[in-house]
Amino acid sequence: CIDSLDTYSKRLYEKYLLRCIVGQTRDIEKRAIESNESVYDTIISAHTNLGELIALRPGEKFDIDKELIDAINSITNKETKLMKTGYGSVDKFSGGLTRGEITIIGGRPGHGKTTFLINLLSQMIHSGLKVVFFNRELPNSEMIKKLITLESGKLSYGMVRQGIYDDSEIDELKRVKSKIAELYNEEKFLMFDNIRDFARSSTEVSKFKPDVVMDDYIQLVQPSGHFDSRRLQIEQLVNDYKWLAKEHECAVVLASQLNRSVEYRD
């Protein structure tokens, strides 16, 4: 009953705010048509009136007691948001990937960003975690060839890419095919090479609800609007990914190409 009352009260208050908006817009329209004041004074007045409506929005609640209890319970129950990367040196200093946070892998072309992500992907899948991988640069077919090389340990990438095998290597290829089909099934792994923008990427994350999201690489994501500089575009994308990580309680790993200017710093 209390929940129903709270819901009804919230809806009633929202209806009141909508009526206020209608009233304010009528006043703004009337003032714009009939007033002899300058257009800038009219704009300032409209901005002020709408700002007053924004102030009527109920504030967000923060319960320190609840947050403290949740934190203590998490500690005592040894619950953790960390996921091991499989890289000992990384796990030693960071503990691994963290749910609700992003990790950015930066490097110049050819420095192994994609290779690092593929190894990280393998570690996550072998740990039983769900992963979404966005390929902005390579087609899925090439990524699969890299996975075959990684999961085999016997077949080289050049061999797989060129299709040069003998009978024993064909047997190994069949074995790896079965292994990958079992491990990287559609319930645990999705990979896209045809999604250009963040909005569609976010939609796929919302539907799949992964533990880890990987994006290789973010400079190739199509911007959602106009930006005065590439830097502002990347900042907005990183912010969008930060909120996505928090909303879905997943870890996000982004590969990013470093600006050449870093090579000339003192």
Per-segment meaning from a language model:
Residues Y217:
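Walker B catalytic acidic pair
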Residues Q233-A255:
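Substrate-engagement module of ASCE P-loop NTPases
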Residues R161-Y165, P223-E235, R265-D266:
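Flexible beta-alpha connector loops of hexameric P-loop NTPases
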Residues M214:
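Walker B beta-strand of ABC/ABC-like P-loop ATPase nucleotide-binding domains
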Residues C1-I75, H111:
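Short, small/acidic-rich helices and loops at N termini and domain boundaries
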Residues G59-K154:
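The Walker A/P-loop phosphate-binding site
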Residues K92, H126-K209, P223:
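Cytosolic-facing regulatory segments adjacent to core modules
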Residues L220, R260:
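Residues immediately C-terminal
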